[in-house]
């Protein structure tokens, strides 16, 4: 979603559905999913509850759509590092870690939207939780693929270690338990990739 800078003027120009999603994101991130009512979202979006229900059948459906947008942003990061470092899987993995590291300052104020949402959605049948679980599974598959392309002998193990570090850094930043989390994150991920031992600096030939 867009930055909150100059929010009133910017939001007024958005179509109704996007305005609702923008307001929902602001409130869900700052106050939590459960605490925010549909009425509060309507007021923030300068619309009505009836208008919200024209676009989203239920509040759960609105939460799920917000999660899809957040997930798409993360998937775009994979696309971006692959485009920036074609045929260089090591740089792709490190670039992904850098994307997370550079976003930690925002997490220190609001926390990871996936982690926060999972804590509020214990029911695994909730549509938003299903979106999160599907996103995480897809993200893992892509990271395993990067590790495999990098020639790591155990791509699944390497991807698991990297995932633990990426997600652990986000939680540690949110609770303030570890300083210089971004710097430490980068060092650990680079160490994982190098430790698994592969000549990753050599571009792999393009397929097709």
Describe the function of each predicted region.
Residues 91-92, 106-127:
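Amphipathic alpha-helical segments used for helix-helix packing
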Residues 63-70, 77:
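Alpha-helical DNA-contacting segments of helix-turn-helix folds
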Residues 1-15, 199-208:
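N-terminal intrinsically disordered/low-complexity leader segments
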Residues 65, 79-106, 155, 159-162:
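Hydrophobic alpha-helical connector segments
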Residues 75, 91-94, 124-149, 160, ...:
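Amphipathic alpha-helical packing segments from all-alpha helical-bundle domains
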Residues 2, 19, 23-61, 65:
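Helix-turn-helix
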């Amino acid at each position: 979603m867009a930055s909150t800078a100059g929010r009133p003027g910017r939001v007024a120009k958005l179509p109704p559905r996007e305005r609702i999603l923008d307001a929902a994101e602001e409130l869900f991130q700052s106050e939590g999913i459960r605490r925010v009512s549909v009425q509060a979202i309507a007021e923030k979006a300068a619309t009505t509850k009836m208008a919200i229900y024209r676009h989203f059948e239920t509040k759960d459906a609105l939460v799920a759509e917000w999660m899809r947008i957040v997930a798409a942003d993360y998937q775009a990061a994979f696309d971006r590092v692959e485009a920036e470092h074609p045929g260089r899987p090591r740089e792709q993995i490190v670039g992904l870690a850098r994307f997370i590291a550079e976003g930690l300052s925002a997490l220190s104020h609001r926390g990871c939207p996936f982690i926060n949402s999972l804590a509020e959605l214990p029911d695994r049948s909730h549509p938003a939780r299903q979106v999160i679980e599907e996103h995480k599974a897809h993200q893992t598959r892509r990271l395993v693929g990067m590790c495999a392309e990098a020639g790591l002998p155990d791509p699944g193990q390497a991807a698991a270690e990297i995932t633990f570090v990426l997600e652990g850094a986000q939680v540690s930043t949110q609770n303030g338990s570890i300083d210089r989390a971004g710097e430490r994150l980068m060092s650990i991920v680079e160490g994982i990739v190098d430790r698994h031992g592969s000549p990753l600096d050599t571009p792999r030939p393009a397929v097709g």
